[in-house]
Design a protein with these regions (language model features):
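Alpha/beta-hydrolase fold nucleophile elbow
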Residues: 143-155
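N-terminal membrane-anchoring alpha-helices
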Residues: 1-23, 268, 272, 284
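C-terminal catalytic histidine-bearing segment of alpha/beta-hydrolase fold enzymes
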Residues: 247-250, 254, 264-352
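Short beta-strand/loop motif that positions the catalytic acidic residue
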Residues: 232-233, 239-241, 245
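Hydrolase active-site cap/lid region
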Residues: 163-229, 246
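Glycine-rich nucleophile elbow surrounding the catalytic serine of serine-hydrolase chemistry
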Residues: 153-163
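Membrane-embedded segments
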Residues: 34-136
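Short beta-strand immediately N-terminal to the catalytic nucleophile in serine-hydrolase-like folds
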Residues: 151-153, 179-181, 240
Length: 352
């Protein structure tokens, strides 16, 4: 249920023929990416339109590979970590690559994790983190500058992207930023709220048996706990979620945004667990602290309402910009295809 990597849509894809799936002829370099634990991953490097348009048309099939170095040194690159199921050739993912290469004038590196598509191995939380680092290292080894690389994840890919962003931040590597589209705060929370097609809560049958849900979660091997590590990321962060996402509730994005904001808010002393043991003074102090925290929170936040599109909430702290974009439409899979989302990405991360 977590990975669904056997659902290799589109079926029998020809990854060495990316133009068959809507990308322009000669714009994409299909290659194999090696990992530190000796797995081989399928990957596409897609040229920025700004570079692609300098190549005489029609380009040779190897045009993207031949132009790789120039593309990486002259234009920013987005590493795109997709969600569960399917492959890098899924139409909705192709739409996003095309938009990013045109609207943002960015190159795109899209990989398939181990066990997905034409990649070797079986997926695991540690394995996907290793795959993400391999993608980063490949870009750097081919001439990309860290501050030209935007790390982006969708759904499951947000946990992968966050883990890479945390690792790089701990290594004091300064990169362009982090985008989380339709994220979940942790796998523990997701299993409580996830609904298939927005209609069938996966945990509903277990809630009918006392403690069954807690027992099930205790056996989760893949935690993907973005919420517990996101504050370690030291670059600008954009969180994007559609209010009509019926797969993963937009409350997950609220939780991640609140976690990033929390260190800049005054603390509130906890009240005694037993209501009868609370003194009048404790309750008064608690109310005062809560009011102060709310006041400081509102002073830090700015809101921009965009009619018929959504709302953008932003704060700047420690020199970093943190943005939460809530769109009215886009559902779970298509929020990244919205032109409004792409414009927000362009503005937050100063794409040309």
């Amino acid at each position: 249920m977590i990975y669904m990597n056997d659902l290799k849509l589109p079926w029998n894809a020809q990854f060495d023929a990316p133009d068959k799936y809507g990308l322009a002829p000669g714009k994409t370099f299909n290659f194999k990416l090696g990992t530190s634990d000796n797995h081989t991953l399928g990957a596409w490097f897609i040229l920025s339109d700004a570079i692609y348009h300098t190549i005489p048309f029609p380009p040779s099939p190897s045009a993207a590979e031949q132009t790789l170095s120039e593309a990486l040194t002259s234009h920013p690159t987005i590493i795109f970590f997709h969600g569960n199921a399917a492959t890098r050739a899924l139409p909705v993912r192709i739409q996003q690559y095309s938009a990013f290469t045109s609207k943002l004038c960015a190159n795109v590196l899209a990989i398939d994790y181990r066990g997905f598509a034409d990649s070797q191995g079986s997926p695991s939380e540690d394995g996907l983190s290793t795959d993400a680092r391999a993608a980063w290292d490949w870009l750097i080894s081919n001439g990309a500058k860290p501050d030209d690389i935007l790390i982006m994840g969708h759904s499951l890919g947000t946990a992968v992207a966050s883990a890479l962003a945390v690792t790089l931040s701990q290594e004091a590597v300064r990169f362009k930023g982090l985008v989380l589209m339709s994220p979940f705060s942790s796998m523990y929370t997701l299993v409580d709220t996830y609904s298939v097609f927005g209609l069938f809560p996966v945990m509903l049958p277990l809630t009918m048996v006392p403690h069954a849900a807690d027992l099930y979660k205790s056996f989760l091997q893949h935690k993907f706990d973005t919420l517990s590590v996101i504050t370690k990321v030291k670059v600008p962060v954009l969180i994007v979620h559609a209010e009509n996402d019926w797969d993963i509730s937009h409350t997950h994005s609220d939780a991640i945004f609140d976690a990033l904001l929390e260190p800049y808010l005054p603390s509130v002393d906890a009240l005694p667990n037993e209501p009868l043991s609370r003194t009048k003074e404790q309750w008064s102090t608690y109310q005062t602290q809560v009011a102060k925290k709310r006041e400081v929170r509102e002073s830090l936040l700015s809101r921009t309402y965009m009619p018929n599109f959504g709302v953008m909430v932003k704060f700047v702290a420690s020199g970093e910009t943190i943005v939460l974009l809530k769109t009215l439409t886009g559902s779970h899979n298509e929020v990244g295809t919205l032109e409004g989302t792409q414009e927000v990405i362009r503005n937050v991360f100063s794409f040309a």
